[in-house]
């Protein structure tokens, strides 16, 4: 509870405020989550809000949960613009996990970078090596790649262009 997760249907980061459990043969399992924030002074109970199916959400940042829920394959099923929006609202840790999943599909990674706002894109490219930046730019549309090159530091531009 309290950790942010991806609401796949809404393509947004949300917090779980209540968990629904069921007893299975091998122990308790999560069956649903309530992402509705409780009201002040506890007016309205969580029991009054329907829990949504556990499979409608995607854990991020928890390697045990991410692996067992095939996080990478579920993240990559979102549209590039949706992934970019989620990355833009993510914390640094969440951002790193999402970028690692997206990095597994180079074409999707390029599409996501095309959708990021200019400041976020520039910051993320700054953190990569020249070779990584060149590889990413090579898969981007020409106009987006040109804009990204212009956002690079002056001393990196020619090096990256030479690597293309």
Where are these regions (language model features)?
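Hydrophobic packing positions in regular secondary-structure scaffolds
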Residues: 1-164
